[in-house]
């Protein structure tokens, strides 16, 4: 498959030291198009959408923000904490706007498992179906997110 300049430029922006210290691709050797295709299939197989996942992350982020960095337990199963830094970061897909530099740490209390995401990550999931590459510090595995955050497939007829 011949790669287009558009995708090569996006991938370049995701490399370490460009927008973030560690980059967004981790140790994933696949092309960005392959990462997107694989995650699209994974999310579809779960019966949810990128928007469903992003909305749940956005809702939890809002709760964490309201606590100004202090931990908060939500729904008796999730402990949230947010770390915010000055500034903002652009979308590597050249999407308009910028995301605040914020990292949310979410511990699933029954299992002790942790999920970590960023505000930019929420945008990239919703607008681009991008969960970051394997090995990236902020890679969000769709299956884990759906399971640990209790994201349910929409019922037929739900809007």
Describe the predicted segments one by one.
Residues 1-159:
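Alpha-helical interaction/linker modules in multidomain eukaryotic proteins
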